């Protein structure tokens, strides 16, 4: 069941709706992080596991495959990922996730990540694309134990090329994020957009991106701030430090530029946060 969602969101299901569940458990074996256990129901699954980095790190790049046809009202995705002590993983998707117009029912997504001591997770899915008249609820929670490290990136696109004034608007997009850190308050973040307020909430922009990283410090803050201020085509960008959590916000109408900047920030801070030089997932270039 989705934490923070009403029970009514799960009612009125039909045979056309599908529920997909994926559970992943990573462990450290002989100095290498491996996928020890996998359980899945429905069309979401692990497409591929790569080890493109040097032998010293052995950080797997794991691609999560979601339905290429996109999601419609009544569909549900539940993803649970656990990193056992000392393990590391980079998770991404081979393509964007598309949320289409609904029949009055919500599309529901739940992501739960548990990072045990001295682990590292990079959660870097490709863009989420929200089409007009969609109803979406997304709940994502990260639990970090002492010594855990994390980088989270997300890009939200409203329409395939962003909404046009006469193109339409969402019914509801409700996105909740919680990052639980071991020694500080962490973050509770919510973005709720509907047909009445989406222009104001996004300040007229069509693409929103965020990046979160921990543990961070003031030096990392300065580095990222300089990257944002020196980038053109990003109309609004900001970065702040909440205890040990770095928070980056970007708004633009240029999908390619905002993606390039987000990936550039990741590549610069990865050695600081994760302790490894950046190796871009191959799927980002296909």
From Swiss-Prot:
GO terms for cellular component: cytoplasm. InterPro entries: UreD. One of its GO terms (molecular function) is nickel cation binding. It is found in: Cytoplasm. The keyword Protein transport does not apply. Keywords: Chaperone, Cytoplasm, Nickel insertion. Its main location: cytoplasm. The keyword Cytoplasm applies. UreD, UreF and UreG form a complex that acts as a GTP-hydrolysis-dependent molecular chaperone, activating the urease apoprotein by helping to assemble the nickel containing metallocenter of UreC. The UreE protein probably delivers the nickel. Required for maturation of urease via the functional incorporation of the urease nickel metallocenter. Belongs to the UreD family. This is Urease accessory protein UreD.
């Amino acid at each position: 069941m989705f934490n923070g969602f009403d029970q009514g969101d799960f009612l009125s299901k039909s045979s056309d709706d599908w529920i997909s569940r994926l559970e992943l458990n990573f462990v450290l074996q002989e100095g290498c992080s491996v996928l020890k256990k996998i359980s899945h129901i429905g069309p979401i699954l692990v497409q591929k596991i790569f080890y493109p980095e040097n032998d010293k790190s052995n950080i797997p790049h794991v691609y999560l495959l979601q339905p290429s046809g996109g999601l419609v009202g009544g569909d549900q995705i539940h993803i649970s990922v656990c990193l056992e002590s000392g393990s590391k993983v980079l998770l991404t998707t081979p393509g964007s996730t598309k949320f289409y117009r609904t029949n009055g029912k919500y599309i529901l997504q739940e992501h739960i990540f548990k990072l045990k001591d001295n682990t590292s997770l990079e959660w870097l899915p490709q863009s989420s694309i929200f089409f007009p008249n969609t109803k979406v609820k997304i709940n994502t929670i990260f639990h970090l134990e002492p010594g855990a490290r994390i980088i989270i990136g997300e890009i939200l696109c409203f329409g395939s090329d962003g909404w046009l004034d006469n193109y339409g608007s969402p019914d509801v997009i409700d996105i909740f994020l919680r990052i639980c850190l071991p020694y500080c308050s962490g973050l509770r973040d919510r973005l709720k957009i509907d047909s009445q307020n989406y222009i104001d909430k996004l300040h007229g922009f069509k693409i929103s991106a965020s990046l979160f990283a921990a543990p961070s410090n003031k030096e990392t803050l300065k580095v990222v701030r300089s990257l944002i201020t020196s980038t053109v085509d990003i109309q609004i960008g900001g970065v702040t430090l909440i205890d040990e959590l770095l928070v980056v916000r970007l708004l633009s109408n240029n999908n390619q530029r905002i993606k390039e900047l987000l990936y550039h920030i990741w590549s610069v801070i990865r050695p600081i946060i994760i302790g490894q030089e950046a190796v871009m997932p191959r799927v980002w270039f296909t």
